[in-house]
């Protein structure tokens, strides 16, 4: 069996938070120093751009932001919804909103231009 990546528990989890998560960057540094496996941050909800940058600098290789993108899509649908507009007509607005946020996160994570 091969472990390809490792999700670390440093103060985040999946979903929306009632309060801003508190990152344990010392824990991240310890794990990153002891492990050669790429590290994953589960649950980026509530983190600032600076928090994400600190995580990447500390050794995080993959960040999950589904909840953020899901809420972005829902907001775009809500903004453009009318009684005469269906899901098909909403998709361009949703796609553009999620694309915009994804490109922003790629710049923050330092992954833009690398695919």
Where are these regions (language model features)?
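Short, small-residue-biased leader/transition segments that mark boundaries at the very start
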Residues: 1-3
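Glycine-rich phosphate-binding active-site loops on the catalytic face of alpha/beta enzymes
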Residues: 10-14, 59-76
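Glycine-rich tight-turn/loop motif centered on a GG-T
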Residues: 13-25, 62, 79-94
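Extended, intrinsically disordered, low-complexity segments
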Residues: 78-115
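Alpha-helix-loop-beta-strand connector modules within alpha/beta enzyme cores
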Residues: 20-41
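Hydrophobic faces of well-ordered beta-strands that scaffold small-molecule active sites
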Residues: 6-8, 39-43, 61-65
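Catalytic cores of alpha/beta
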Residues: 44-58
């Amino acid at each position: 069996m091969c472990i390809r990546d490792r999700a670390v528990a440093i103060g985040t989890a999946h979903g929306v938070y009632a309060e801003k998560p508190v990152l344990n960057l010392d824990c991240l540094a310890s794990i990153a120093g002891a492990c050669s496996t790429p590290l994953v941050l589960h649950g980026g909800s509530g983190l600032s751009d600076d928090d994400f940058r600190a995580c990447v600098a500390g050794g995080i290789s993959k960040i999950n932001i589904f909840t953020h993108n899901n809420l972005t899509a829902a907001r775009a649908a809500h903004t453009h919804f009318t009684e005469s507009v269906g899901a098909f007509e909403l998709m361009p607005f949703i796609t553009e909103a999620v694309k915009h946020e994804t490109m922003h996160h790629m710049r923050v994570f330092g992954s833009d231009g690398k695919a």
